[in-house]
Amino acid sequence: MTQVKALVIGDLMLDHYIWGSCDRISPEAPVQVIKIQNESVCLGGAGNVVANLLSLGASVGVISVLGDDKEAAQVEQILNELGAKNELIIKDHTRQTSIKSRVMATHQQVVRIDKESIESIECESELIAGFGKIYKNYDVILL
């Protein structure tokens, strides 16, 4: 059987998990005080789709826009380690690479903190041109 070639186009981001426990309420405000025990980072958004496709044995290419920051480098490092092909990942210095941080205490999500750019992307024509050059190399395209 031949390997499926999938092209994933979408928002790459980091999912950051902060795991801890809570045994008291803050005296400053009625909120839980979380004692951090562990932290982990993995691909989120379209990156989660990429990771799942790779785990199923597909060959995966990626088209996306990231910020020009350390988080983008972390996303690219994880993609490389997983074996994804960087077809077209544009670094935009005006954008923040998205990070979704979730604080977990006693197996419950306490809060999610989003750090991201929500403005429309400015490099649409570059993405469309890049897509036009490579889409025929893939069996399936996921948006």
Specify the residue positions occupied by each region the protein language model found.
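Positively charged, low-complexity intrinsically disordered leader regions
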Residues: M1-D23
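Substrate-binding N-lobe of the ribokinase-like
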Residues: P27, Q32-I99
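Short hydrophobic segments within beta-strands
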Residues: I9, I63-V65, M104
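Short acidic, glycine-rich surface-loop motifs adjacent to enzyme active sites
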Residues: Y138-L143
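Conserved phosphate-binding/catalytic loop of the ribokinase/pfkB sugar-kinase fold
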Residues: I89-R95, R102-Y135
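A short, aliphatic-rich alpha-helical micro-motif
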Residues: M1, Y135-K136
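Short acidic, glycine/serine/threonine-rich loops at helix termini
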Residues: L14-C22, E71-E76, I99-V103, K115
